[in-house]
């Protein structure tokens, strides 16, 4: 039976350390990190995520602000607001909650954020730094997973890692971070031939395909470490992952649950990156 990777407990531990670091810097400089989150429209899931981010920022001792904009906000208005925060040195992190309404171009919005304040790590400049082996801002979910590996003593060097899912938010940066730790990485997706066979060779399996219970025990090697990034709802509205937890946990050595696994770590890493952006602003 697999040991559970408790993302909630680890996130709380790291959040406590972050609050201590923030308090020390405030004592020394009289300043605190500032994080602004921009929410356009009334997407219920987005409202929950934004509330969690605000709560986490306040718990870390940050200044936190949420800009709630109506659904009909134009792209020009949104870009203008972002530029206001780009130019304001009191704010060190800018997060725009995705998805945005259909009439707004996500890419144009992400490009508009100052790369130094892009704590999501989605700006092409930050992606390029990650690919070139000089990461500054890293997408928070992969960063959280790497923190889990560190905490639970998961050896990466020389290991075979398979990532299922090729998004810019999780799959691609995850593969890059694993490569940087000298794992041998295979990046796969829904159209990969013989996907189960490929996955079954993995010592470390990261699943971010966005399909409920997609990965069964047929995908998993005995003793593998399994990270489930999925957030799906079943027919009863229950939150489930991309991994069939009950059967995979019988053969994995370590596994993340859904909920309580990767999700809490993502928010904590956003806070950590806001703190680091604040520190860099003090040094510049």
UniProtKB/Swiss-Prot annotation:
Keywords assigned: Amino-acid biosynthesis, Histidine biosynthesis, Hydrolase, Methionine biosynthesis, Multifunctional enzyme, NADP, One-carbon metabolism, Oxidoreductase, Purine biosynthesis
EC number: 1.5.1.5, 3.5.4.9
Protein name: Bifunctional protein FolD
PROSITE patterns the UniProt entry points to: THF_DHG_CYH_1, THF_DHG_CYH_2
Coiled-coil boundaries: none
One Pfam family it belongs to: THF_DHG_CYH
Catalysed reactions listed for this entry: (6R)-5,10-methylene-5,6,7,8-tetrahydrofolate + NADP(+) = (6R)-5,10-methenyltetrahydrofolate + NADPH; (6R)-5,10-methenyltetrahydrofolate + H2O = (6R)-10-formyltetrahydrofolate + H(+)
Gene: folD
Family, as annotated: Belongs to the tetrahydrofolate dehydrogenase/cyclohydrolase family.
GO molecular function terms noted in the UniProt entry: methenyltetrahydrofolate cyclohydrolase activity; methylenetetrahydrofolate dehydrogenase (NADP+) activity
Binding site for NADP(+): 165-167, 190
SUPFAM superfamilies reported for this sequence: Aminoacid dehydrogenase-like, N-terminal domain, NAD(P)-binding Rossmann-fold domains
């Amino acid at each position: 039976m697999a040991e559970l990777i408790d993302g909630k407990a680890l996130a709380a531990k790291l959040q406590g350390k972050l609050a201590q670091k923030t308090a020390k810097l405030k004592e020394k400089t009289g300043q605190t990190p500032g994080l602004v989150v921009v929410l356009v429209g009334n997407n219920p899931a987005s409202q929950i995520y934004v509330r969690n981010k605000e709560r986490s920022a306040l718990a870390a001792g940050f200044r936190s602000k949420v800009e709630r904009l109506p659904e009909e906000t134009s792209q020009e208005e949104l870009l203008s607001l972002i530029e206001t925060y780009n130019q304001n040195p009191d704010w060190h992190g800018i997060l725009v909650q995705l998805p945005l309404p259909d009439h707004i171009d996500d890419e144009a919005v992400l490009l508009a954020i100052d790369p130094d304040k892009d704590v999501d790590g989605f700006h092409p400049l930050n992606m390029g730094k990650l690919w070139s082996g000089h990461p500054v801002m890293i997408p928070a979910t992969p960063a959280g997973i790497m923190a889990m590996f560190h905490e639970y003593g998961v050896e990466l060097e020389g290991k075979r890692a398979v990532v299922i899912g090729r998004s810019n938010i999780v799959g691609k940066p995850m593969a890059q971070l694993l490569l940087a730790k000298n794992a041998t990485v295979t990046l796969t997706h829904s159209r990969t031939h013989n996907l189960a066979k490929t996955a079954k060779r993995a010592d470390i399996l990261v699943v971010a395909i966005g399909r409920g219970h997609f990965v069964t025990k047929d995908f998993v090697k005995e003793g593998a470490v399994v990270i489930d990034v999925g957030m799906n709802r079943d027919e009863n509205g229950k939150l489930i992952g991309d991994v069939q937890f009950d059967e995979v946990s019988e053969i994995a050595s370590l596994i993340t649950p859904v909920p309580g696994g990767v999700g809490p770590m993502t928010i904590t890493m956003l806070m950590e990156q806001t703190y680091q952006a604040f520190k860099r602003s003090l040094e510049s």
